[in-house]
């Protein structure tokens, strides 16, 4: 579905937008450290670990016995890097909880039978996905879950706006249901503010299709994502 290309794009954007990204990455790492302070975490699971730009691996690897970095694909550089950290491992897995395979199979069925795409039934329970006594971090991934799935579906089948919204809702709500089963930290974009060429706020776009879970500690910050105006 284009995962490797997408991760390469993230790193290229980071190098291009380093000034605007650094504060966001620092905020993410500091938020994680504050939330984990004085918690006796034995196993930490990171969903959407990617390039580890926003995760304080060096510090936490010395404090937590087991750290599992979970993503659909791990860059070779990251696979080599974690070999220097005992107790840290890369796990390749579908962080949507099986939805990627489900949508892929549904497309194949519709093409084989030459029938319109129908929204697949979903019966998978979130219980038992994570090991007992694990602590989970959803790391800047919630509003990204649908991007590659929808891009793939658009290349294969006609896709209406209502179906796109349904997919986004399902992926985000399923993700939140997964988090309900364990202690967790959620870091996510929830709103996109577009700035016009004169430097004034132009459009606000909601990025979430699922309700936040109750939390004891929250923090908001702005991420200057695209100062060069190349994002679309």
Where are the model-predicted features located?
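Conserved beta-strand signature within the Rossmann-like core of class I S-adenosyl-L-methionine
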Residues: 137-138, 160-172, 178, 182-189
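Conserved SAM-binding loop of SAM-dependent methyltransferases across substrates and taxa
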Residues: 50-64
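Charged, low-complexity C-terminal accessory regions
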Residues: 190-232
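Conserved SAM-binding motif I beta-strand of class I
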Residues: 66-71, 92
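S-adenosyl-L-methionine
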Residues: 83-130
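A short SAM/SAH-binding and catalytic strip from SAM-dependent methyltransferases
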Residues: 115-127, 131-154
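Conserved class I S-adenosyl-L-methionine
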Residues: 40-52
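Class I SAM-dependent methyltransferase Rossmann-like catalytic core
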Residues: 1-41
């Amino acid at each position: 579905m284009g995962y490797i290309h997408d991760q390469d794009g993230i790193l290229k954007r980071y190098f291009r937008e380093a000034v605007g990204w650094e504060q966001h990455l620092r905020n993410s790492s500091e938020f994680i450290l504050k939330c984990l302070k004085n918690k006796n975490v034995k196993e930490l699971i990171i969903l959407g670990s990617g390039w580890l730009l926003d995760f304080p691996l060096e510090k936490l690897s010395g404090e937590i016995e087991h750290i599992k970095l979970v993503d659909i694909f791990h860059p070779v550089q990251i696979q080599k890097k974690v070999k220097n950290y005992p107790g840290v491992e890369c796990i390749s897995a579908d962080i949507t909880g099986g939805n990627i395979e489900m949508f892929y199979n549904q497309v194949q069925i519709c093409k084989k039978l030459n029938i319109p795409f129908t929204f697949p039934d979903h019966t998978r329970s979130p219980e038992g996905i994570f090991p007992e006594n694990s602590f989970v971090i959803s790391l800047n991934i919630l509003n990204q879950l649908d991007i590659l799935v929808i891009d793939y579906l658009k290349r294969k089948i006609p896709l209406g706006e209502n179906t796109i919204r349904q997919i986004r809702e399902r992926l985000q709500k399923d993700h939140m249901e997964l988090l309900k089963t364990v202690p967790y930290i959620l870091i996510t974009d929830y709103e996109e503010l577009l700035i016009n060429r004169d430097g004034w706020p132009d459009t606000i776009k909601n990025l979430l299709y699922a309700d936040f879970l109750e939390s004891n500690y929250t923090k908001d910050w702005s991420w200057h994502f695209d100062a060069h105006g190349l994002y679309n």
